[in-house]
């Protein structure tokens, strides 16, 4: 599923991400825009670690989810990577919360590259929240 921007903003707010660990809703929108273009089915393979990033938050199979093929995987969120690509993003959000609790928002490279230090208010502009 490819979310429309304001639809995703509303969904993330309902699931408790607005202000979670001090991260604003606009920052989560910026992160997901640059990680996956709001697409729950996004995947990206990382040849170096032989791991794959999954779903709207691009959660990595080396550390956070189990895809059954990543060497020495940790599965920190105790979730199948396939579950992070469901149209229902509850499990993906639960895992993203764990990542931000343990490592902070800087765990996401796209956030550091595209969102940190930028005015991200436009990501929620015009949305009825």
Curated annotation (Swiss-Prot):
Keywords: Antimicrobial, Bacteriolytic enzyme, Digestion, Disulfide bond, Glycosidase, Hydrolase. GO terms for molecular function: lysozyme activity. Its EC number is 3.2.1.17. Residues 1-129 form the C-type lysozyme domain. The active site is at 35, 53. Disulfide bonds join 6-127, 30-115, 65-81, 77-95. InterPro entries: Glyco_hydro_22, Glyco_hydro_22_CS, Glyco_hydro_22_lys, Lysozyme-like_dom_sf. GO terms for biological process: defense response to Gram-negative bacterium; defense response to Gram-positive bacterium; digestion; killing of cells of another organism. PROSITE patterns: GLYCOSYL_HYDROL_F22_1, GLYCOSYL_HYDROL_F22_2. Signal peptide: none annotated. Coiled coil: none annotated. It catalyses: Hydrolysis of (1->4)-beta-linkages between N-acetylmuramic acid and N-acetyl-D-glucosamine residues in a peptidoglycan and between N-acetyl-D-glucosamine residues in chitodextrins. SMART domains: LYZ1. Belongs to the glycosyl hydrolase 22 family. Lysozyme C is capable of both hydrolysis and transglycosylation; it also shows a slight esterase activity. It acts rapidly on both peptide-substituted and unsubstituted peptidoglycan, and slowly on chitin oligosaccharides. The sequence of isozyme 1 is shown. Lysozymes have primarily a bacteriolytic function; those in tissues and body fluids are associated with the monocyte-macrophage system and enhance the activity of immunoagents. Monomer. This is Lysozyme C-1/C-2. It comes from Axis axis.
């Amino acid at each position: 599923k490819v979310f429309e921007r304001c639809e995703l903003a509303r969904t993330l707010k309902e699931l408790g991400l607005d202000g979670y660990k001090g991260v604003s809703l606009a920052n989560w929108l910026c992160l997901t825009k640059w990680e996956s273009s709001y697409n729950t089915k996004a995947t990206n393979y990382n040849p170096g670690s032989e791991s794959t990033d999954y779903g709207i938050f691009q959660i990595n199979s080396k550390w956070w989810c189990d895809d059954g093929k990543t060497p020495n995987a940790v599965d920190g969120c105790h979730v199948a990577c396939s579950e992070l690509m469901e149209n229902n993003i509850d499990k993906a959000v639960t895992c993203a919360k764990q990542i931000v609790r343990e490592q902070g928002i800087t765990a996401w490279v796209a956030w550091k590259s595209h969102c940190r230090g930028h005015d991200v208010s436009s990501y929620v502009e015009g949305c009825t929240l």
